[in-house]
Amino acid sequence: MKVITTRLNNGLTIATQKILESESVTTGLWIKSGSRNEAAAEHGLAHMLEHMAFKGTKKRTARDIAQEIEDVGGEINASTSVEITGYFSHILPNDTDLAIEILSDIICNPVFDSQELEKEKHVVLQEIGSNNDSPSDIVFDHFMAVAFKEQAIGRPILGTEQSLQTFQPKDFKNFMAKHYYGENMVFAGVGAVDHDKFVKSVENYLGDLPKQQEKHQNKPAKYIGGRIIDPRELMDAQIVMGFEGCTYLKPHFYTAQLLSLILGGGMSSRLFQNIREKLGLCYSIYAFHWGFSDNGIFGISASTNKEGLEKLIKTIIEEIKLLTNNISENELKRAVAQYKAAIIMSHESSAARAPTIARQLLTYGEILPNKEIFKRIDNITITDLKKLSEKIFFNSKPSIAAVGPVENLLSTEELSNLLAQ
């Protein structure tokens, strides 16, 4: 199923993928702008903007936006990440133009009413409160904050109570003027979609979108590392430990993905088998690798009780050291199969394909066919895995964040010493 792209005169890229058996369409607008594009005084603005876009336009109230889509059985939503914001809808084919028009309206004509803003601040404050009350969520905020200290990429996407209170309507207009322009966007449609009709519809509503504003380059993300604890009276401690990873723009990204699968991807992984199954030290444990445009983070997440915390961390470090010395062909083969299957399975629905297409175009400027990604994965060797594991685990200061009964958590110096032994 081929992805067809068209670029409008204003730089906006339109991409469609027709799925013959599909009876619906996922369409949306994705912008290469997220929380890391915020200045310090704008912390949380990208996410709040996503909320405010649905709070009314020059021709629609917030209720109108929701009702017009739901009157035809559709859905509309949005999401904000570190580097990309998306506004999207899932509708029946005959309502594709309606969805495109509404999505275009909330991007081009938001009113940012001051009363609606004050109400939405309270909504997002509850979202922040819910996140802060969840140890398994807040520990990741702490982890990113210590890994990328005092940088936008390390700040929580939701913002804080203090930062939200300062926002005014003009702040959203200024942020959109900087980042919401044609060359910084992709409008994608996947499912029962006709490319020519889709392009005509998008051009009709977004053809006058500005082509390019003054480009604002993000400061390169600099990995720092360190330790942060959040003592709470809980039964279990939630921890995330990690190291500097790889940008998704470099070939090593795929090697890092395989490393995370071998170490802690699934029930057959080393961490799960050796730490949970054999030793019973925790209920949940897994490894992950997140790539960004100029950096990445490799991490391990786990939970255990107060008595088992130190042993858990020391055992994780032992598993890391073993990984750099011995990786079997069977482990590599299994990780490759897992990664390929995950990619294929993630493309089974139009709701998953549309953002994937948009992100690839915003990230790489092209669509990476599965066979090209699989070729890169198949070319990874055990030697590649060992070399990268040494670079990741022994060339950067560890980061560790913990929530719960964690007052006696090992320091980063102690972690580094254990790794060096």
Where are these regions (language model features)?
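Short, low-structural-confidence N-terminal segments
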Residues: 1-3, 9, 17
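Flexible, small-/acidic-enriched active-site or ligand-binding loops
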Residues: 226
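Active/ligand-binding-proximal structured segments within catalytic/core domains
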Residues: 11, 18-69, 180, 241, ...
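Charge-rich, well-structured scaffold segments of protease-associated domains
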Residues: 3, 7, 62-220, 229-230, ...
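Short amphipathic beta-strand and strand-loop transition segments with alternating hydrophobic
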Residues: 16-18, 287-288
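Functionally critical, cavity-lining and gating residues within the transmembrane helices
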Residues: 268
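Conserved catalytic motifs of the protein kinase core domain
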Residues: 24-26, 236, 297
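DNA target-recognition domains and sequence-specific DNA-contacting regions of bacterial/archaeal
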Residues: 223
